[in-house]
């Protein structure tokens, strides 16, 4: 018996690489896989399902954070707060449809004034053609 840390693996084996890094993702594929197994969504979970779900979650997070960052910059802030998330989601048609039933704590509401409540515009009399005969 030889002493060492090989543990029965081939001597030329590569270093361990996470499934997230193999897929080029920042979201944890292993954790998503564990949550899919423990959540009783199905008896069995395929190998590609957690990778795909982690990629979708990462894309959604990136999309929302980009729009929220733009909202924060428009308000001359450097930190994203729940209000910026609310503005980002409600001003985007597809995200609003996806997250329409979601309540964001401390998000506030969108600024909106009904047309009937706005002051009436009065026609200006002046340089128009004369109505006299």
Curated annotation (Swiss-Prot):
Any one annotated GO CC term: nucleus
Biased composition (Gly residues): 1-10
GO biological process: DNA repair; heterochromatin formation
Short motif [ST]-Q motif, span: 130-131
Domain of life of the organism encoding this protein: Eukaryota
Modified residues (N5-methylglutamine): 106
PROSITE patterns: HISTONE_H2A (PS00046)
Places the protein is found: Nucleus; Chromosome
Cysteine disulfide partners in this protein: none
Positions bearing Phosphoserine: 130
Alphabetical keyword list: Acetylation, Chromosome, DNA damage, DNA repair, DNA-binding, Methylation, Nucleosome core, Nucleus, Phosphoprotein
Residue numbers marked as site, Not ubiquitinated: 120
Chain segments carrying region Disordered: 1-24
Modified residues (N6-acetyllysine): 5, 9
Functional summary from the UniProt entry: Core component of nucleosome which plays a central role in DNA double strand break (DSB) repair. Nucleosomes wrap and compact DNA into chromatin, limiting DNA accessibility to the cellular machineries which require DNA as a template. Histones thereby play a central role in transcription regulation, DNA repair, DNA replication and chromosomal stability. DNA accessibility is regulated via a complex set of post-translational modifications of histones, also called histone code, and nucleosome remodeling.
Comment block on domains: The [ST]-Q motif constitutes a recognition sequence for kinases from the PI3/PI4-kinase family.
Similarity comment: family membership: Belongs to the histone H2A family.
Quaternary data: The nucleosome is a histone octamer containing two molecules each of H2A, H2B, H3 and H4 assembled in one H3-H4 heterotetramer and two H2A-H2B heterodimers. The octamer wraps approximately 147 bp of DNA.
The protein's name in its UniProt record: Histone H2A
Organism of this sequence: Aspergillus fumigatus (strain ATCC MYA-4609 / CBS 101355 / FGSC A1100 / Af293)
Lineage: Eukaryota, Fungi, Dikarya, Ascomycota, Pezizomycotina
Gene name tied to this protein: hta1
């Amino acid at each position: 018996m030889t002493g060492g840390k090989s543990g029965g693996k081939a001597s030329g084996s590569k270093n361990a690489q996470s499934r997230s890094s193999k897929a080029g993702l920042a979201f944890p594929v292993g954790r998503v896989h564990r949550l899919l197994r423990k959540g009783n969504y199905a008896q069995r979970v395929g190998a590609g399902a957690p990778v795909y779900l982690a990629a979708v979650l990462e894309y959604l997070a990136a999309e929302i954070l980009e729009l929220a960052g733009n909202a924060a910059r428009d308000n001359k802030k450097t930190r994203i707060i729940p209000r910026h998330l609310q503005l980002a989601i409600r001003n985007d048609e597809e995200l609003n449809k996806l997250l329409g039933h979601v309540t964001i704590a401390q998000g506030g509401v969108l600024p909106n004034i009904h047309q009937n409540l706005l002051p009436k515009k009065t026609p200006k009399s002046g340089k128009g053609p004369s109505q006299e005969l």
